[in-house]
Amino acid sequence: SVAWGDESAETLREQIVNSCILELPPRCKEILTMFYYQGMTLDEIIIARGEKNISKNGLKTGKYKCMESLKAKVRDTFSKYKLKY
């Protein structure tokens, strides 16, 4: 059993999350990457994606749904491998 303080456990956790991100639809992948990894604001994401017909609240809702989808994939993967998160 591996404790979560262990470096190998943290690496495994990161690999699982990254793998689950890759399984997301392209729009979700892009939005979550821009927001969480690149530190972009919602306004910056709207501009970068060239989305003229979406409001900040619309993007916020979309990001939330993408995040919920990612969380579900991560939970499923952890339970499939009998890991605790």
Residue ranges of predicted features:
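Amphipathic alpha-helical segment used for protein-protein interaction
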Residues: 1-33, 40
